[in-house]
Amino acid sequence: MKRRRPRSDWRRLLARRDGFSLLEVLIVAVIMVVAMTLAFARWQGYTAQQRLRFGTAQVATDLRQAQERAKSERAPYTVTFLASSSAYTIARAGGGFLENTQLPDQVTATASQVVTFSAFGRPAAAYTVTVQNSWGSGSATVNATGGITYQTP
């Protein structure tokens, strides 16, 4: 008959264990809460950044659209940015077509003056439109020759 070796204390503890201790569950819960908090903070920053990038691209695209409409319809067009607002209007000078455009949530656009394109699509001056939110700011620029560019951080 073989003799059984006595088990050491730690082996006996492991053999009788049916689940996790309260301390182990609490440690895992704390680690998960910290990880979710960090992920949420990064997600908020990411969404703010994407809203800013989308809003800046939208402003540049709408400026190009107003310029192209001015050329195709042989009529001056204006783009008016309301002071620190998330809305702006594209209008045909002297009436006619009017479009109100809304920027993404928490994004505002400001310009020092009304952007005007002649009937040939030429800007009346060089313009810079600043687009901003809690993450930072970007800009859409119309140069004196009619080129339109935008920059985001």
Task: For the regions a language model picked out, list residue spans one by one.
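Hydrophobic aliphatic residue packing
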Residues: 23, 27-34, 70, 79, ...
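Membrane-proximal N-terminal amphipathic helix
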Residues: 45-76
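N-terminal single-pass transmembrane signal-anchor helix
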Residues: 2, 7-43
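Terminal low-complexity, poorly structured segments
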Residues: 8-10, 59, 99
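Type IV pilin-like appendage domain
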Residues: 76-128, 134-153
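Hydrophobic/basic alpha-helical segments enriched in Actinobacteria
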Residues: 20-21, 43, 66, 76-78, ...
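Long, low-complexity, intrinsically disordered polar/charged segments
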Residues: 40-48, 99
